[in-house]
Amino acid sequence: MLPITPLELTPPRLQGVAIPGSTRDLAGSYALGLVVAVIFYATLLFGGSLHGYDWGSHHYNYFDWVRISLTEFHTLPLFMNDAWVTKNFLANAESPILGPLVALLFVLSTGAYIKLLLVLFTAAGFAGMFFLLRDIGVRLEIACFVATVFAFNGFFVSHLSVGHPWVMGGQLLPGLVCSYRRAVLGRGGALWLAAAINAFTILGGQHQPFIWQNLVLAFLALLWAVRARDARPIRLWALLVLATLGLGAVKLLPMLAEFADYDPTARVQGLPLSLVLTAFLASGQQPDWAPPGVSYDHGSGWWEYAFYVGPVALGCLAVGLALARRCWPMAVIAVGFSILAIEWPPLLHWMDVWSWLDGLPIWRTQRGPSRFLFPALFGFAVVSAVGLQRLWERDLGRWPRAAPLAALALCLLAAAELHAASLPWQRAALGEALTSRDHRPRPLVLGTSGVITAELQAFAPNRLVYRTRAERPGRIVFPFRYGRGAAEWRVEGPTGAAKRAVSEGGKLAVDLPAGEGDIVMVYQPRFFNAGWVTSALTLLIVLGTLIRSGRNRGRLAARRAPA
């Protein structure tokens, strides 16, 4: 059956729509993405060790602590004494302990693992955007061009250079949208793929992209349902959300318990309206770049506003946007996120939507609105690709040989501009090799009076052993918190019997009898057991659904086969 509307991201009719993207397209684009990612990030990959900015302060050590826990203790760390924001490492929004490839840390060094993730996620972003556009019906040349601009724009480069590995999750947005779109158009298995992609994002500690992509999906489902006058997009979105929550419950439940009242005070300003073109076009951008009109607060820098795409790419995208048709749902989403991301001058203060939202649940987790320009850029790229395809069919198709060569030349030129602009960022990330830290709680010996002391005897990621000495009964206070709402530690005394932990000033404290003995402390985050049970049950349900659907399709095909 021919496509009803070959260039519709959200077709008004949900039945009989052809989906031209093939497995060959996906495999070929991912292989190409791997090659281009290695070439593009060659300086970062082979020029030295990750060192600068947040790599050196904490993010490198998050990955390294996982490696140490796996290789030396053969477990995943639920507790990290020197983690930022919270020592509950399972609930830590930036913790990478449940990433889908974390087992590779058994055999790879920390730096090699992070760089491998960079290449794999970048290739996923390239392939996801390419495949999404091919599914819509966009020509190969245009899909390749737009995928290059998306996967290698300055947003990813800048955040990676300053030690924000969570940004890699943003590369999964095109694949997530593509899978959801396929599910709405009748590919049932695509819904579970979308749920898996969504869950992988949060399980790997990529918390900000997880929020952005779910906002994009929610708005897309709503607007698509309005356009199609059909509730199916919303029903499948709700099922996708439920499956995501179930698969990711092992992390999401502890996170919700930890950050239910999270409201960051370190807010940074949006992108000033006067600097929008600067962010997309200006050369010489690097971490310490400070153009007039922007002020850096709370440790922020230009990476909060770096969205370089270059003049060639921006010009082509603008032409595509001008010619696009039948893409208003995604265009509305892109415009809406753009309005959120910009800091509007006093004359346009009525457009300052962010001031209405920054105190609401979900929205208040965002440190600053400028990062919303990323989902806006994604939306504009998709809409522009449709417009460029229209231009091709209307005008460029007259030159069947010259047009593909011109498109390839523009793609290479745009990639060259992006690469040249990325080099200062890549170099800023490098430095001396970082070494593993001693993650033991400090001080190693507790107690000052000599009446009661506790000395750390054994240390593992989720288990501590203290040797206690008490001249008379008393209380010892340990250098970590009691817990949020309930005790996070199971404490056993010298005989193995459980001891009652109490809170003293928010710290964990234990009442000791006179004498000497060992106290064993086992870390148990709130809702950990409920989380992994929920995730396991959801996974079984998803697998069972896929198996049953496969059998039903097989029976249906057998009935249709000629005798």
Language model segments and positions:
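Hydrophobic alpha-helical membrane-interfacial segments at the cytosolic entry of transmembrane helices
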Residues: 29-34, 230-256, 268-270, 331-338, ...
